[in-house]
């Protein structure tokens, strides 16, 4: 298992934006939907962060988001 930012697909490499006011709800549900233990909205970059993601789950790699792929 790993702790990291989930991405929509490995090729696109785009994190999931979130509203920092929604402390646990959206990201926690998103992460659990990807079989993680829990998740939250990281305030400094307003992106979902997951704890306990399966090792084969796509996560943020270095480089930019490619929304057009």
UniProtKB/Swiss-Prot annotation:
Locations listed in the record: Secreted
Listed PROSITE patterns: LCN_CSAB
Disulfide pairings: 14-65, 18-41, 27-48, 31-50
Tissues showing expression: Expressed by the venom gland.
MF terms in GO: sodium channel inhibitor activity; toxin activity
Domain LCN-type CS-alpha/beta: 2-66
Biological process according to GO: defense response to insect; envenomation resulting in negative regulation of voltage-gated sodium channel activity in another organism
A Pfam short name: Toxin_3
Keywords: Disulfide bond, Ion channel impairing toxin, Neurotoxin, Secreted, Toxin, Voltage-gated sodium channel impairing toxin
InterPro entries to which the protein is assigned, alphabetical: LCN-type_CS_alpha_beta_dom, Scorpion_toxin-like, Scorpion_toxin-like_sf, Scorpion_toxinL, Scorpion_toxinL/defensin
GO CC terms of this entry: extracellular region
Notes concerning its domains: Has the structural arrangement of an alpha-helix connected to antiparallel beta-sheets by disulfide bonds (CS-alpha/beta).
Family of this protein: Belongs to the long (4 C-C) scorpion toxin superfamily. Sodium channel inhibitor family.
Function: Inhibits voltage-gated sodium channels (Nav). This toxin shows insect lethality against crickets.
Name this protein carries in UniProt: Toxin Tma3
Phylogenetic lineage: Eukaryota, Metazoa, Ecdysozoa, Arthropoda, Chelicerata
């Amino acid at each position: 298992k790993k702790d990291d930012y989930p991405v929509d697909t490995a090729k696109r490499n785009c994190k999931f934006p979130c509203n920092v006011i929604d402390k646990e709800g959206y990201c926690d549900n998103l992460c659990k939907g990807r079989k993680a233990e829990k998740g939250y909205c990281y305030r400094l970059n307003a992106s979902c962060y997951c704890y306990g993601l399966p090792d084969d789950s796509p996560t943020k790699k270095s480089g930019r988001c490619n929304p057009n792929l």
